[in-house]
């Protein structure tokens, strides 16, 4: 059933361990990932540049194939990160990077802190000369944190705390009034988190193990997925501070802590949960009128903002809620000896009771199939997940395979309601819109998933990447698919070097394109060859709009 090793997508090149990044190639099968996936510690390495080259301007090379898509303006999407300026150079581009960033896309930061210029403080990366500053540990001060002040003059304790000096001039203790805590009595009774703590904006900066948190722009975090320079950092409350946050939708706030001069790890924070408000009297609740559950207000909207400067950032752990229409198809029985039970394909939620996926993912009995919405970590049962059984599988009638290539590779899954309803809208679960018009070639779109196909393992964390739509005549060229692409298919790939970023996603998962702040499911991950070297092939959703709408109307009375 699922044995298409050479054709269907092997869709993972980068996987995440905890909150650190490791490389993983499904083609090697050298070392399977640890089934427990405990967070690994990360060693920071420094990038050296040759003295006779300008690291701030890097041109693309022949290894970056410019034949991947037709685009008159390679700078249209601004592929340069961290505020870099894109410069057109013939058919390609280069990035002029603001200090201290360098690299072909300004993705690397020069480490001004490697010689430890801060004697009694933390060295932080900044974007203004000299591109670092010292955050001194009180009572030390000065540009290099070498000067010490009287510990209790002036009183550093907040909220009425009383400062007591120790024998050593730099040591002191704050005696805090009731309901206040922290080194400076800065944490008040209202400093708590609700739910999973995604919205927490308090000032706790210690972990459950009483380790101090690193600043989010610490030089030790430059290569971490989550730092002050990440995409939409401000949206997640991340800035130049060391307060606990939860940008990835974990079950409580966390932060990075220092292990040694080059090594960090992450730990959960010592933050209290906000008290639950009093519930109404049960008798009174019974007297309230029964209200129908509201439907989804709109489609294609995410509550996670993007920076104005777009990034091509494939292979990173996706921010929780960034792809709220992403679906995980899971089986209760092993499909093959190499494909155990659990996640095996992706999908897209297009209506509270309907999931769009690839037809080649549906050769399975509905009694062994379940759909999980809002999933971020496959190894955890997260509080915001919603799980449903499948009432019916409806494949497109003309789906077929010729020479191991799927044609008209599309199917609908009708969800079985739970408690009288299907999916409930939340920050983590939303529907994606169906497109009404085609997007032009060169449009930058999104793929997401856990990097799993029918033939291999993948990431436990949801990954995402950006790809560009490729004109079918170009995709049918001899260098690519040599006239095997029909009008039910669409190709998409990146200007990345071969072997990176073009295989993030799952069979059946969505290819979404954005217009005016709304996301549309424009393709369904279908198949591909030479992962990372050739673009992916997707079912073109616009070719099947009439079938989708007719089927949903007939089956559900929409």
From Swiss-Prot:
Peptidase S1 domain segment(s): 312-553
Known tissue expression: Liver and kidney.
Cellular location(s): Secreted
UniProt enzyme class: hydrolase
Residues annotated as catalytic: 360, 409, 507
Record-marked site positions (Cleavage): 478-479
Superkingdom to which the source organism belongs: Eukaryota
Post-translational modification: Proteolytic cleavage at Gly-23 or Met-27 can give rise to the 50 kDa heavy chain (HC) and cleavage at Arg-311 or Lys-317 can give rise to the 27 kDa light chain (LC). The HC can undergo further proteolytic cleavage giving rise to a 26 kDa fragment. The LC can undergo further proteolytic cleavage at Arg-311 leading to a 17-kDa fragment and at Arg-478 leading to a 8-kDa fragment.
GO BP, one annotated term: proteolysis
Signal peptide limits: 1-23
Domain spans labelled Kringle: 191-274
Record-annotated EGF-like domain positions: 71-107, 109-146, 148-186
Function, as annotated: Cleaves the alpha-chain at multiple sites and the beta-chain between 'Lys-53' and 'Lys-54' but not the gamma-chain of fibrinogen and therefore does not initiate the formation of the fibrin clot and does not cause the fibrinolysis directly. It does not cleave (activate) prothrombin and plasminogen but converts the inactive single chain urinary plasminogen activator (pro-urokinase) to the active two chain form. Activates coagulation factor VII. May function as a tumor suppressor negatively regulating cell proliferation and cell migration.
Assembly and binders: Heterodimer; disulfide-linked. Heterodimer of a 50 kDa heavy and a 27 kDa light chain linked by a disulfide bond.
Protein name: Factor VII-activating protease
Organism name: Mus musculus
Gene: Habp2
């Amino acid at each position: 059933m699922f044995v298409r090793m050479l054709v269907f997508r092997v869709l993972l090149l980068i996987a995440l361990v905890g909150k650190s990044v490791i490389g993983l190639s499904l083609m090697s099968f050298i070392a399977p990932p640890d089934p427990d996936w405990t967070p690994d510690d990360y060693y920071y390495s420094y990038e050296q540049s040759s003295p006779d080259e300008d690291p701030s301007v890097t041109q693309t090379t022949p290894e970056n194939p410019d034949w991947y898509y037709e685009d008159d303006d390679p700078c249209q999407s601004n592929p340069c990160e961290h505020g870099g300026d894109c410069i057109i150079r013939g058919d390609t581009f280069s990035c002029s990077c603001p200090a201290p960033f360098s690299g072909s896309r300004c993705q690397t930061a020069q480490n001004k802190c490697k010689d430890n210029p801060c004697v009694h403080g933390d060295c932080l990366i900044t974007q203004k000369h000299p591109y670092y500053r010292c955050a001194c540990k009180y009572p030390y001060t000065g540009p290099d944190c070498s000067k010490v002040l009287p510990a209790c003059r002036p009183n550093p304790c907040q909220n009425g705390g009383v400062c007591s000096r120790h024998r050593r001039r730099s040591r002191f203790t704050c005696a805090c009034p009731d309901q206040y805590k922290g080194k400076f009595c800065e944490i008040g009774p209202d400093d708590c988190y609700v739910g999973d703590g995604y919205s927490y904006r308090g000032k706790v900066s210690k972990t459950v193990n009483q380790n101090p948190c690193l600043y989010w722009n610490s030089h030790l975090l430059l290569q971490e997925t989550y730092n002050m320079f990440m995409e939409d950092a401000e949206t997640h409350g991340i800035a130049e501070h060391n307060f606990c946050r939860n940008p990835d939708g974990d079950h409580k706030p966390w932060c990075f802590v220092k292990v040694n001069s080059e090594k960090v790890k992450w730990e959960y924070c010592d933050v209290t949960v906000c008290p639950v408000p009093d519930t109404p009297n049960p008798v009174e609740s019974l007297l309230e009128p029964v209200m129908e559950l509201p439907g989804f207000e709109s489609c294609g909207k995410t509550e996670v903002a993007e920076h104005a400067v777009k990034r091509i950032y494939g292979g990173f752990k996706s921010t929780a809620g960034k792809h709220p229409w992403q679906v995980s198809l899971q089986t209760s029985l092993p499909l093959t000896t190499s494909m155990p039970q659990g996640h095996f394909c992706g999908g897209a939620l297009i209506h509270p009771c309907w999931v769009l996926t690839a037809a080649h993912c549906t050769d399975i009995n509905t009694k062994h199939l379940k759909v999980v919405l809002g999933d971020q970590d496959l190894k955890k049962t997260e509080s915001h997940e919603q799980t449903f059984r499948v009432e019916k599988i409806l494949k497109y009638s003309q789906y077929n395979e010729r020479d191991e290539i799927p044609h008209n590779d599309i199917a609908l899954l009708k969800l079985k309601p739970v408690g009288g309803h299907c999916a409930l809208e939340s920050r983590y679960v939303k529907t994606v819109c169906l497109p009404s018009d085609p997007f032009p070639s060169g449009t930058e779109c999104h793929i997401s998933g856990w990097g799993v196909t029918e033939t291999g393992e993948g990431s436990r964390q949801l990954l995402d990447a950006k790809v560009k739509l490729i004109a079918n005549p170009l995709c049918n060229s001899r260098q690519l698919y040599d006239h095997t692409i029909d009008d039910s298919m669409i190709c998409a790939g990146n200007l990345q070097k071969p072997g990176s970023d073009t295989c993030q996603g799952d069979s059946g998962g969505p290819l979404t394109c954005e217009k005016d702040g709304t996301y549309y499911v424009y393709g369904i991950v279908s198949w591909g060859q030479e992962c990372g070297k050739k673009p992916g092939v997707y079912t073109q959703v616009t070719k099947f709009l009439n079938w989708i709408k007719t089927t949903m109307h007939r089956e559900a009375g929409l």
